């Protein structure tokens, strides 16, 4: 008894060392990766060590029992040899079992490796499918982002174009204002030139008048000298006539008329001298006044000429400044017009490139949408296949559960639980045995026929119940699959709408 218990404990301990509990075995199976062969070798070595330990323990037990044999005197050498032979057989069997278990464990590890590789491949395929499903949304986000950037650039270009147009309009208004001012200045210049010409004509007239006056003064001086000469000659003639008349009178009455003639001559001389002095003084005063007036007019004319010359010079300087400013504004306007043309050309080129990009992105979006629809159709087909498989699995599971519950509750045989509608397969073994021994007695045959009818009724009821339960299970699974399909379709439509 002690040897058997020890051997059982050693076998169980070695089995536990090999397989462990359920959780340990599952953890080892799930954690087995690329080092599966190494683990199998280590486990085989540990199993061999455990078997060696068990053999040593059993040998110790035999040794103790053999040592006890002289005390008990009940165990002989034949029994010991039989036990050693039995132990050798058990040990060889145990080694074979351990080797077989190690082989099975290696097969299980290889299968786990295969399943892990398949699982990784399926996970990679699932990740690729998810990435493909997520790519349209990413492409849509990229498309929307690029479209927003293009719209922002388009708005910036339009705002820059509007700003350039406003600047161009402002510069055009400034040019128009400067042109109007230039025309006004040119009109003022023409008026100043006309006034200058008029003043020059006045100056010329004044100079001519001065020359005429100078000539008149000269002629008057000459005339005054001639008048003086004529006056002197007349005075001389008068004196001569007076002398002649005085001589003639002297001949008549020299004594009486001599004082009267001298006084009369003195009076006449005084009158002529006073008249000549008055004429000379009046001529000098008129000449002086006329000369002063001419000098004043000449001074005024020279001042006006100088002012008009300064004004003309100022007008010329302003005109040159305005012409320079107009030329600069004209150059700025031309440069701005060139910039506007360049901006319009660049804007049109950018708009064309953006439209090309938008068309390409729309084509990519349509392609991704079509690919997404194809993937959705494939996913829907796979989902339909999965739901059909789930329906079948659920139906078989419900059938198996129903069979197990009926088998556990009732003591019927498995043949009575056959869901086939043929009643000939639903007969119990005792009915078949009774049909074979039907020719023994007529009473027994009738009784057996009644039992067969009852059994067939029971079997038909059971088959009808199984069929009803199967139909109920199918209806439940169909309803659940329809609900899941509807929810999946709604999710896919929502995701497609979001995309």
UniProtKB/Swiss-Prot annotation:
Positions with biased composition (Polar residues): 432-443
Keyword Acetylation: yes
Entry's transmembrane regions: none
Keywords: Acetylation, Coiled coil, Developmental protein, Differentiation, Glycoprotein, Intermediate filament, Neurogenesis, Phosphoprotein
UniProt-annotated stretches for the region Coil 1A: 88-129
N6-acetyllysine: residues bearing it: 290
Chain spans, region Tail: 409-499
Region (Coil 1B): 143-238
Region of interest (Coil 2), ranges: 263-408
Pfam families: Filament, Filament_head
Region Head, annotated ranges: 1-87
GO molecular function, one term: structural constituent of postsynaptic intermediate filament cytoskeleton
GO annotation (BP), single: intermediate filament organization
Region (Disordered) residue spans: 431-463
Family: Belongs to the intermediate filament family.
Subunit-structure text: Forms homodimers (in vitro). Forms heterodimers with NEFL, NEFM or NEFH (in vitro).
Function field: Class-IV neuronal intermediate filament that is able to self-assemble. It is involved in the morphogenesis of neurons. It may form an independent structural network without the involvement of other neurofilaments or it may cooperate with NEFL to form the filamentous backbone to which NEFM and NEFH attach to form the cross-bridges. May also cooperate with the neuronal intermediate filament protein PRPH to form filamentous networks.
Protein name: Alpha-internexin
Source species of the chain: Bos taurus (Bovine)
């Amino acid at each position: 008894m002690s040897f058997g218990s020890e051997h059982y404990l050693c076998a169980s301990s070695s089995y536990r060392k090999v397989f462990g509990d359920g959780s340990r075995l599952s953890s080892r199976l799930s954690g087995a990766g690329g080092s599966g062969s190494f683990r199998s070798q280590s486990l085989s070595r540990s199993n061999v060590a455990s078997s060696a330990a068990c053999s040593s323990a059993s040998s110790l037990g035999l040794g103790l029992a053999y040592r006890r044999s002289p005390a008990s005197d009940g165990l002989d050498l034949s029994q010991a040899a039989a036990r050693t032979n039995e132990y050798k057989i058990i040990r060889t069997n145990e080694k074979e079992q351990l080797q077989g278990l190690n082989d099975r464990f290696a097969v299980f590890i290889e299968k786990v490796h295969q399943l892990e590789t398949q699982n990784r491949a399926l996970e990679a395929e699932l990740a690729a499918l998810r990435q493909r499903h997520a790519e349209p949304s990413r492409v849509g986000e990229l498309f929307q982002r690029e479209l927003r950037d293009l719209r922002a650039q388009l708005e910036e270009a339009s705002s820059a174009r509007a700003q350039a147009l406003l600047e161009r309009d402002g510069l055009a208004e400034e040019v128009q204002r400067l042109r109007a001012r230039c025309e006004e200045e040119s009109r003022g210049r023409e008026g100043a030139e006309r006034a200058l010409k008029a003043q020059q004509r006045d100056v010329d007239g004044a100079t001519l008048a001065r020359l005429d006056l100078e000539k008149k003064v000269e002629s008057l001086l000459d005339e005054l000298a001639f008048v003086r000469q004529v006056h002197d000659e007349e005075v001389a003639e008068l004196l001569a006539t007076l002398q002649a008349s005085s001589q003639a009178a002297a001949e008549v009455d020299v004594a009486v008329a001599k004082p009267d003639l001298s006084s009369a001559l003195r009076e006449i001389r005084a009158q002529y001298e006073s008249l000549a002095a008055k004429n000379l003084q009046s001529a000098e005063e008129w000449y002086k006044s006329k000369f002063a007036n001419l000098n004043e007019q000449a001074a005024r004319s020279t001042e006006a000429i100088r002012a008009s010359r300064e004004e003309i010079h100022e007008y010329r300087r302003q005109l040159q400044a305005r012409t320079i400013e107009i030329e600069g504004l004209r150059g700025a306007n031309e440069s701005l017009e060139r910039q506007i043309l360049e901006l319009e050309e660049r804007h049109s080129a950018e708009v064309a490139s953006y439209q090309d990009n938008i068309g390409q992105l729309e084509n990519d979006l349509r392609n991704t949408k079509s690919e997404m629809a194809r993937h959705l159709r494939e996913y829907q087909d796979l989902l339909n296949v999965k739901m059909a498989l789930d329906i079948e699995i659920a139906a078989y599971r419900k059938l198996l559960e129903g069979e197990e519950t009926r088998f556990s509750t009732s003591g019927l045989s498995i043949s009575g639980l056959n869901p086939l509608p043929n009643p000939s397969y639903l007969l119990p073994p005792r009915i078949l045995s009774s049909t074979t021994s039907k020719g023994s007695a007529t009473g027994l045959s009738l009784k057996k026929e009644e039992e067969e009818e009852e059994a067939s009724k029971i079997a038909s009821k059971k088959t009808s119940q199984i069929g009803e339960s199967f139909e109920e299970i199918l209806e439940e699974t169909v309803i659940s699959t329809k609900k899941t399909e509807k929810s999946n379709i709604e999710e896919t439509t929502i995701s497609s709408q979001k995309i």
